[in-house]
A protein has these predicted regions:
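Preference for solvent-exposed, low-hydrophobicity sequence contexts
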Residues: 12-21
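Extended, loop-rich substrate-binding clefts of extracytoplasmic carbohydrate-active enzymes
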Residues: 25, 29, 36-38, 47, ...
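Beta-strand-rich recognition/accessory modules
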Residues: 180-275
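Low-complexity, serine/threonine/proline-enriched polar segments
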Residues: 156-190
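Beta-strand elements of well-folded, non-transmembrane domains
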Residues: 108, 124-130, 141-147, 233-235, ...
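Intrinsically disordered, low-structural-confidence terminal and linker regions
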Residues: 1-10
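Acidic (Asp/Glu-rich), glycine- and aromatic
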Residues: 113-167
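Hydrophobic residues positioned within well-ordered beta-strands of beta-sheet architectures
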Residues: 104-106, 118-122, 227, 244
Length: 275
């Protein structure tokens, strides 16, 4: 189904490719998914917003593509079940042609509590129309969370960093010779769930995370975290396609160590996107 702008007469229309789950409803611009009190929404015309997660007074966003709004053109898009694809052009000096495929409820979901869990994956693709260009793109996640803990899956084992992070400025660069998966597990306020973000060392360049006190939060111990994952080289050539992916999983905090390890292990064993 092709994407078209919604008019006031069809804002409640659902597509003929609804996912099998009753909680997932799509229209001509994106979809809405509900899990208990949590609502996840995606609008393909706003790739920078990614997937918004709202529950009560708490609002977070995951898997937003950082594209310059003043030079951004939304060229095309479509919805197929729980997958949404958007095609974008940047009409600036970089002349990038970028696509994002957002997918809900993939193979990463915690199986022991699937009704209260959510999995989202973004596959990011980009190339340039110039002979050479800066190809770096960031995917942004913005959370209100109490703490974040980092961990890494490498050589068949998962290692958690011993200390959790609160107010911080965090930077990491991919340097592993084998495929490693980095995990950022955010403890969300107001309900007992953890949101974990996973990236692969062979597809990501570096990650930057900052945090400040969340003044607008109803939880006094909450912080606002901004996680930016940077993909693709700073110099790319015309005719060469670059592709990377990032996964976010929402699951119960009481079993986060188990399902984070399982998700990281499964993600590490996936074949490369470009071979």
């Amino acid at each position: 189904m092709k994407i078209e702008k919604l008019s006031p007469d069809n804002t409640n229309r659902t597509s003929d490719t609804e996912a099998s789950e009753d909680t997932l409803r799509s229209n001509s611009l994106g979809w809405t998914h509900t899990i208990g009190s949590l609502t996840a929404q995606l609008n393909l015309e706003k790739p920078g917003d990614g997937i918004s997660l709202k529950s009560g007074n708490t609002s977070n966003s995951i898997l937003g593509i950082c594209l310059p709004q003043q030079a951004l053109t939304f060229n095309d898009g479509w919805i197929r079940g729980n997958e949404a694809t958007g095609i974008y052009a940047m009409n600036d000096a970089r002349q990038l042609q970028t696509s994002g495929l957002w997918r809900l409820q993939g193979t990463w979901c915690p199986t022991k509590d699937i009704e209260n869990s959510l999995t989202a994956e973004l596959i990011l693709s980009s190339e340039t129309l110039r002979e050479k260009s800066d190809g770096s793109l960031a995917v942004q996640c913005v959370f209100q969370a109490r703490t974040v803990q980092t961990g890494t899956w490498c050589t068949n084992s998962f290692h958690w960093e011993p200390e959790t992070l609160r107010t911080c400025a965090y930077w990491s660069e991919s340097s592993s010779q084998t495929v490693a998966v980095q995990c950022f597990a955010f403890q969300l306020p107001e309900f007992e769930q953890t949101l974990a973000v996973f990236t692969r060392s062979d597809e990501i360049h570096h990650t930057v995370m900052t945090s400040t006190a969340a003044k607008e939060s109803h939880a006094p111990d909450a912080y606002k975290y901004v996680l930016k994952s940077y993909f693709f080289p700073t110099i790319i050539e015309k005719g060469v396609l670059h592709r990377g992916r990032i996964v976010a999983v929402l699951g119960p905090s009481r079993t986060e160590k188990d399902w984070c390890t399982a998700a990281a292990s499964a993600f590490a064993r996936q074949p490369p996107l470009l071979q």
